[in-house]
């Protein structure tokens, strides 16, 4: 009798384990669909939140921190300051920053990163970041990415504060860590794939972007292999030599905002596509007194 009870109990456990595995797989599939729907709704919510914030400004203390740290601040035209500050406020209110190590000046970091990420979309909807769940801030080394200064997936950004702090004041070097990683985020947003095409495959601009990426990939390869200086930083060439193209949009974005005049001169098609996408014209930005 005891053996029969034991066998029945064992059979029940096996059945429950099987049932759990089967249903957990189903849940994961359903969860991904639900997550996408939630993110789309989040996009609507973010745009509404930005609309409610319209007219709000950063405090003098916050503005001073941005002026003292972000090199691009002195170049941004006055007519973009209001929408830039509104997006910065909305960003800080709606996105989660995670201090991955103790001792970081996290409030200052939040303001600086939010400000640069918001400059990227100063003329675009904040729903571009609808899939973003968290921004992880590390002192120096990013866990599992020892050689990287920053990483991006569709849902998460990782940034090294030591590197960011050292380089953020350089407004014309063509490489901006925050803009670079958040450009990846925008690239991921429409289809979950980073292929340097920031629009949906259903967009009327998709084929034009596709051709541009292929053509620019070839140009960047030739420049890199020939050791030539180029408006789009060599990192894009280094990645491209392996056949990868995700870095073209992110490196191109950094060049667009920080080397606008040169990019327009050397790669007019790239510049015009970026100008149309971002809605700004950095080639005509002039430093303010």
Residue positions per predicted region:
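Feature marks short, highly hydrophobic, charge-poor N-terminal signal-anchor/signal peptide-like helices
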Residues: 1-12
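Metalloprotease/metallohydrolase-associated module, dominated by Zn2+-dependent proteases
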Residues: 2, 114-123, 140-153, 163, ...
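Alpha-helical transmembrane segments
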Residues: 14-26
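N-terminal topogenic membrane-targeting module
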Residues: 25-93, 98-99
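Active-site recognition of the HExxH zinc-binding catalytic motif
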Residues: 77, 173-191, 250
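Auxiliary, metal-adjacent structural segments of Zn-dependent hydrolase domains
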Residues: 85-158, 166-168
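Short pre-active-site segment immediately N-terminal to the catalytic Zn-binding motif
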Residues: 161-179
């Amino acid at each position: 009798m005891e053996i029969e009870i034991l066998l029945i109990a064992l059979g029940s456990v096996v059945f429950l384990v099987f049932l759990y595995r089967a249903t957990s797989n189903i849940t994961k599939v359903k969860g991904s669909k639900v997550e996408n729907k939630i993110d789309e709704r989040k996009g609507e919510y973010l745009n509404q939140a930005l609309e409610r914030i319209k007219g709000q400004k950063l405090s003098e203390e916050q503005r001073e921190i941005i002026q003292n740290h972000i090199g691009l601040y002195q170049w941004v035209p006055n007519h973009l300051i209001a929408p830039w500050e509104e997006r910065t406020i909305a960003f800080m209110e709606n996105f989660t920053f995670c201090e991955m190590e103790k001792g970081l000046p996290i409030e200052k970091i939040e303001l600086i990163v939010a400000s640069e990420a918001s400059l990227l979309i100063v003329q675009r909807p904040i729903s571009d970041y609808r899939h973003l769940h968290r921004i992880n801030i590390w002192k120096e080394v990013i866990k599992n990415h020892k050689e990287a200064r920053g990483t991006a997936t569709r849902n998460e950004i990782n940034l090294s504060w030591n590197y960011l702090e050292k380089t953020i004041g350089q407004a014309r070097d063509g490489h901006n860590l925050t803009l670079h990683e958040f450009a990846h985020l925008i690239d991921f947003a429409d289809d979950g794939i980073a292929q340097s095409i920031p629009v949906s495959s259903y967009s009327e601009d998709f084929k034009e972007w596709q051709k541009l990426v292929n053509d620019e990939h070839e140009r960047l390869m030739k420049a890199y292999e020939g050791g030539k200086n180029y408006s789009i930083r060599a990192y894009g060439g280094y990645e491209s030599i392996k056949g990868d193209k995700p870095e073209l949009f992110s490196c191109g974005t950094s060049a667009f905002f920080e080397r606008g005049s040169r990019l327009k001169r050397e790669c007019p098609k790239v510049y015009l596509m970026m100008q149309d996408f971002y809605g700004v014209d950095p080639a005509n930005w002039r430093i303010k007194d």
